[in-house]
């Protein structure tokens, strides 16, 4: 049966706690245990202005990002960041789902080391089919991190609170990063298939007329793989040791080398054929990767024949 969804803006920690009937102990951060919820929340869309991570222990909850369901099975972690709209739908109204997690407002991070680092945790931008599937040991560590944060915010707020809590959150986020890297490794065949498709799609892009539309982007290949750019890029880097963008750039330079060696076309023509709008951008990329300019490469190649 289809239900209409109400949109709820989560612009504060208290807004979330009131939604579920939970107590707010700190205005900028909360450790969540939905088994303590006193209100039913179902068929709603939450407009996030906060960061959140949730670990699902039970089975009866479906989350949606856009129209797509999250890969949110028992024992998985999902993460959200400001600007995301997340739907909550269950088959039955459940007053206290077995879900734990943490939610914190960006203001908590002001003047802390985490403020400048938060953007590096790319899993906040992961989408459907990209949840973290935790082992029993990883779940235990996740719980321990939450308990430490919970203990700290139970104390009266003082000048040290934000620094201590943000550092504990950073430890949790670092663990989640480690767990995702483990997941990339254990999902080896999936990862290998994605890399193979990426390499194949990259070749096809330059063998077609797509270069008339411009240079290929990481986002283009991520969409082909039905992944977010963040998850796709992290998986490719874990597999190859270099970024997806660097693989694209190296492929472009390899093709440029062949064109410069096989033809006498002006360098600007070669650049346009490869998808560059400005030849100087091509020359800059070429020199960064090879150490010499396209002109120097052509001269060196010619003198060696």
Regions from the PLM with identified roles:
Residues 91-155:
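A hydrophobic/aromatic-rich effector-binding and dimerization subdomain
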Residues 1-71:
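Generic protein-terminus/edge-of-domain signal
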Residues 75, 232, 281-282, 286:
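Short hydrophobic/aromatic patch on the recognition helix
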Residues 283-305:
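…primarily DNA-binding HTH/wHTH and HhH modules…
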Residues 67-81:
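Short acidic-glycine-tyrosine-enriched beta hairpin
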């Amino acid at each position: 049966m289809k239900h209409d969804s109400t949109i709820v803006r989560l612009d504060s920690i208290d807004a979330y706690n009131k939604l579920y009937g939970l107590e707010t102990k700190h205005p900028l951060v909360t450790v969540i245990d939905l088994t303590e919820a006193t209100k039913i929340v179902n068929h709603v869309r939450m407009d996030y202005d906060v960061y959140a991570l949730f670990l699902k222990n039970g089975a009866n909850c479906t989350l949606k990002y856009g129209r797509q369901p999250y890969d949110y099975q028992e024992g998985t972690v999902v993460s959200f960041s400001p600007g995301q709209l997340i739907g909550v739908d269950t088959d039955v109204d459940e007053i206290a789902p077995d879900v734990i997690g943490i939610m914190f407002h960006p203001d908590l991070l002001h003047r802390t080391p985490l403020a400048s680092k938060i953007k590096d945790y790319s899993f906040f931008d992961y989408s459907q089919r990209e949840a973290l599937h935790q082992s029993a040991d990883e779940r235990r560590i996740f719980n321990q991190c939450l308990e430490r944060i919970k203990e700290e915010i139970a104390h009266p707020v003082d000048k040290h609170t934000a620094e201590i809590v943000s550092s504990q959150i950073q430890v949790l986020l670092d663990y989640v990063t480690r767990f995702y890297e483990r997941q990339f490794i254990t999902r080896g065949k999936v990862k290998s298939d994605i890399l193979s498709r990426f390499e194949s799609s990259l070749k096809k892009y330059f063998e077609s007329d797509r270069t008339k539309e411009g240079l290929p982007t990481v986002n283009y290949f991520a969409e082909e793989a039905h992944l977010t750019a963040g998850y796709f890029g992290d998986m490719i880097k874990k597999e190859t040791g270099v970024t997806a963008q660097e693989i694209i750039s190296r492929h472009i330079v390899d093709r440029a080398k062949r064109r410069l060696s096989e033809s006498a076309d002006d360098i600007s023509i070669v650049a346009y054929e490869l998808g560059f709008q400005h030849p100087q951008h091509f020359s800059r990329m070429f020199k960064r990767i090879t150490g010499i300019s396209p002109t120097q490469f052509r001269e060196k190649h010619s003198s060696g024949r």
